[in-house]
């Protein structure tokens, strides 16, 4: 039996890329991750994978050099807050410089393939000198002998029920004529495939709210039961709003619209026929996406459940996560969708 090719995951988070690589037969023997809660989640799901270190900047060269000749693929979902349209765009943010550690590990280990993942915003983000960050990254890899290609994918093309655009970078020392899959054959998933009737965090609303939002009766989840727990404070606030204004103009009576946000101050009642909007790590703090439900007692709205968030990000429902609900949502919001990495890895190892 041929041994599985070994891989190293850098900036692993809770293990989205590790799961994706594992699904293609790669053996992710080593990983690095700074946050202890994320490490715990990774360890619970991949007990055979060894933590190289927490702060990648403190992993000595010698530790990486020991892996030379042993690693087929290095994956790095290096931090994206400096490049994200939703994050702070500070060119001096040290998190935006961590790609240097990806380059260092590659130089010392000399893998066959490298895969990087980041937000689409990296395409346009500039350095303090006015050049593109992406050009700087490509040049640093070119200097150590790796030719890189990049492409933007939407995770829904890989069968993830979420519109989540990510920049994927693939590099190797040998020429790659066709480095990226088309993903056109992946089965399509929408929210209807992952949403389940659940009264956790539900709050009762007037049918008039859903009517104004444009929610069709047939797209409301139906079941029985009483609300469980306390509704999210932000949901309570938005449900109580009346006569919503934006830019000094009244735009609606209620602060909700169906399938899209009517204005930046609106929340969205999700349309189960389509994919979710991008889920970010602040969803627990200020959720803007809600599920409509109905019982014999009336109509309700609730946030996504943690199991739904897992599936919306491409994780199985039984994926283990450490920490409280907020910490779990942060982990998932920061994760790379495993099916996207599975498809890319399967293609380059075909």
Model-derived regions, located:
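S-adenosyl-L-methionine-dependent DNA methyltransferase catalytic core
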Residues: 1-28, 140, 166-350
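Core alpha/beta nucleotide-donor-binding catalytic domains of modification enzymes
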Residues: 2-113, 119-134, 142
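Short, surface-exposed amphipathic charged segments that create phosphate/polyanion-binding patches used
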Residues: 66-68, 163-170
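Alpha/beta-hydrolase-fold catalytic nucleophile elbow
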Residues: 77, 117, 154, 170
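A short helix->loop->beta-strand "cap" motif at the edges of active sites that frequently abuts
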Residues: 110-112, 146, 165
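Short beta-strands and strand-loop turn motifs
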Residues: 115-120, 151, 322
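Conserved S-adenosyl-L-methionine
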Residues: 146-157
């Amino acid at each position: 039996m041929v041994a599985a090719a070994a891989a190293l995951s850098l900036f692993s988070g809770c293990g989205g890329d590790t799961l994706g690589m594992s699904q293609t037969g790669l053996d992710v023997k080593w990983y690095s991750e700074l946050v202890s809660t994320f490490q715990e989640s990774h360890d619970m799901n991949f007990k055979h994978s060894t933590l190289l270190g927490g702060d990648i900047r403190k992993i000595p060269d010698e530790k990486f050099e020991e892996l030379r000749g042993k690693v087929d693929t290095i994956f790095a979902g290096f931090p994206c807050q400096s490049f994200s349209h939703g994050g702070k765009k500070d060119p001096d943010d040290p998190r935006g410089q961590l790609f240097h550690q990806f380059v260092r590990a590659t130089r010392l280990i000399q893998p066959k393939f490298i895969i990087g993942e980041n937000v689409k915003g990296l395409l346009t983000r500039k350095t303090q000198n006015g050049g593109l960050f992406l050009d700087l990254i490509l040049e640093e890899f070119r200097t150590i002998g790796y030719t890189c290609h990049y492409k933007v994918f939407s995770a829904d093309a890989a069968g993830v029920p979420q519109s989540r655009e990510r920049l994927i970078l693939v590099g190797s020392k040998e020429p790659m004529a066709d480095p990226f899959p088309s993903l056109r054959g992946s089965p399509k998933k929408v929210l209807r495939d992952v949403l389940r009737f659940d009264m956790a965090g539900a709050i009762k609303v007037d049918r008039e709210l859903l009517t104004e939002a444009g929610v069709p009766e047939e797209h409301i989840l139906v079941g029985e039961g009483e609300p469980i727990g306390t509704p999210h404070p932000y949901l309570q606030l938005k449900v109580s709003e009346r006569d919503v204004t934006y830019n000094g103009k009244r735009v609606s009576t209620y602060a909700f619209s169906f399938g899209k946000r009517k204005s930046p101050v609106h929340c969205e009642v999700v349309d189960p026929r389509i994919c979710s909007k991008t889920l970010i790590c602040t969803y627990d703090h200020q959720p803007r996406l809600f599920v409509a439900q109905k019982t014999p007692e009336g109509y309700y709205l609730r946030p996504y459940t943690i199991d739904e968030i897992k599936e919306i990000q491409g994780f199985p429902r039984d994926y283990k996560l450490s920490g409280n609900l907020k910490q779990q949502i942060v982990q998932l919001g920061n994760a790379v969708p495993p099916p996207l990495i599975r498809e890319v890895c399967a293609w380059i190892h075909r």
